[in-house]
A protein has these predicted regions:
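An alpha-helical repeat/solenoid feature that recognizes helix-turn-helix modules
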Residues: 1-11, 22-85, 94-140, 157-185
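Short glycine/proline-rich, acidic loop/turn segments that cap or connect secondary-structure elements
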Residues: 140-155
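Buried hydrophobic core positions in alpha-solenoid tandem helical repeats
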Residues: 16-17, 86, 90-91, 145
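Short alpha-helix boundary/capping elements
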Residues: 20, 94, 146-150
Length: 185
């Protein structure tokens, strides 16, 4: 992306590495604390002191996927040992419940909303890091996508999602790009 040599990018990625949970993945601090809703709103809705995470709590596959996307764009950091360790955590969590309440239902993996992590975003992230369908966990995710292609050649957006043609077409494009990057035609 042209920013590999930019010190600000380096500083940001190093900060993300320092913010990992003890298990090597990421989450957000408000999830690691037992907070009441009004406290979460106060902490996230205005000026407040930064909340430090409880690093002993487990990683979230959702937040780990989001953070790993930043590392995939950097030629050096996507090969970093700690980043690879986090990628292994993400890979091992495919189709499993998240550690935190908002995504505990494994069906969220196959609910395709453009801005939230799901099976496709995880496979895009892992593919960009060099993982391929020879890996059994990646193969299982790829197989799910292939097996769940609709008769019209597109994919459904997921349980409870209204079918919008344009969104389904964009989803199909992204899936096809990921499959092509995997060498699957």
């Amino acid at each position: 992306a042209g920013y590999a040599e930019d010190r600000r990018i380096d500083d940001g990625l190093l900060w993300l590495l320092r913010m990992r949970q003890d298990d090597g993945g990421w989450t957000i601090p408000v999830l690691t604390r037992e907070l009441k809703w009004d406290e979460i709103v106060r902490l996230t809705g205005g000026d407040s002191e930064p909340l430090q995470p409880d690093r002993s709590r487990p990683f979230s596959h959702n937040w780990t996927d989001m953070v790993l996307r930043a590392f995939t764009a950097h030629p050096f950091y996507k090969r970093n040992r700690d980043v690879r360790r986090a990628a292994e955590l993400l890979k091992g969590s495919l189709f499993r419940p998240d550690s935190y309440s908002s995504y505990r239902d494994p069906r969220y993996w196959t609910r395709f909303v453009g801005w939230w992590p799901n099976l496709l975003t995880a496979l895009e992230t892992l593919t960009a890091m060099g993982y391929d369908a020879r890996d059994p966990e990646i193969c299982r995710g790829v197989a799910w996508l292939i097996e769940n292609q609709a008769g019209d050649g597109l994919w459904d957006l997921g349980p409870g999602r209204p079918e919008k043609a344009l969104e389904r077409e964009w989803l199909a494009l992204r899936i096809c790009l990921m499959l092509t990057a995997q060498g699957i035609r």
